[in-house]
Amino acid sequence: MKEERYFYVPEASAMNELPEEEATHALRVLRLKEGDEMMLMDGKGTFFRAAVSMTSGKHCLYQVLETLPQHPAWQGHLHLAIAPTKMMERIEWLAEKATEVGFDELSLLDCRFSERHVVKTPRLEKIVVSAMKQSRKAWKPVVNEMQDFKIFISQHTTGRRYIAHCYEEVPRVNLFESLQTLPQPLPIREGRKYSQDEEKVKKLVEEVSSPLPYREGQGESLLVLVGPEGDFSIDEVRMAVDAGFVSVDLGKSRLRTETAGLAAVMMMQLSQP
């Protein structure tokens, strides 16, 4: 049985020719000829079974044989916002693996301790498309341009929002546990007063406390912020908490930025119905 060949054609239903880069791969690498079948994906939730109708030089024309709408593999909107590492290969690795695992949106943050302030998103787009084809995903994750941390959190004010960090002085709940079930209030030690930061986190957690499973609320937006190698600054963490983000950890291990990002995506993915 021949392996199905997948090609990314954003306007597959309205076009009849493969984009230049995909055509080159089809003709020069796979050596497709007239009559050969292939699968097209528009990155918007639909696959198309198609056949090569004509080839000419660098051009590869096709005819759609069948339209195959896909059902979402998860119901929420999974969004990772992360500060890029100094070595771009590591963020490129993250973009590839996160796409394979499954998520919806990648944002790049410019933070106080960021080691990189410029990112070429077209290359990340190519990596995401390649991973989307390899893992047979029907939806292409959105890749956003880098944005200042303060501006970013001011623009994201709805849905479940989390900031992962390592500061002991700001109380944290575990991200995976929080995603699996509605968080319970932080434990109170008798005779002890909460600091201002603890009060804010406690209030946020108590507002969503319930014995009902978290999964009861389907199709909701999840956003996790992951900082640079030097972590977010304490001021950035407090700013996010003030804006309604829940302070979380990603477990007991201290993780590299790209590993933390992938862990966050996997936790969001595993929390889906």
Describe each PLM feature range.
Residues 62, 140-144, 247:
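Generic structural signal for residues in well-ordered beta-strands
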Residues 162-180, 221-239, 243-249:
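Active-site/ligand-binding-proximal alpha/beta "capping" segment
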Residues 1-70, 183, 202-205, 210, ...:
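N-terminal positively charged helical leader segments and presequences
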Residues 233-273:
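Structured adenosyl-cofactor binding patch, chiefly the S-adenosyl-L-methionine
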Residues 193, 200-203:
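Polybasic, lysine-rich low-complexity intrinsically disordered segments
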Residues 189-191, 215-217:
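Glycine-biased, low-complexity coil/linker segments
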Residues 71-166:
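RNA substrate-binding interface of SAM-dependent RNA methyltransferases
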